[in-house]
Amino acid sequence: MTREPSFIVTIDDERHELFALADGVITLDAIRAHLDEERAAGALAYRELIDARGATPALSPADLRELIALLRGDALFARHGPTAIVVGTEDAFATMRTLALVLADVITLRVFRDFAEAVDWLAAMPAPTPGPLRPPTWH
């Protein structure tokens, strides 16, 4: 029996921080819903700590390509804040590390096995600059 995916999110608007507890089998649809929640809250640019030690990513190569395209598309119009993801398995570490490397030019994303290291790294990140980069110009 597979556990349903879930993200329990706490947003601190004063500190511009977001904490997400991910659990269950995490699919592309679950990630999409999480990003939609961040967008709706105006929190894309916030520092984000994702505790995914209890989660299992279920992302096919096609899902990863779609997620990369989605995040790159977001980056055209809004900043993503620095994101620390804490994982519980080597497979999850490898998957998320690959994602971090591919997106390094648009998102500051780092993967950890140790929660305290993730917290320290995120605390050292510069304060986020919320809001859009600039309106798109079409010629």
Residue ranges of predicted features:
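Amphipathic, Lys/Arg-enriched alpha-helical "gate/interface" segment within cytosolic domains
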Residues: 1-139
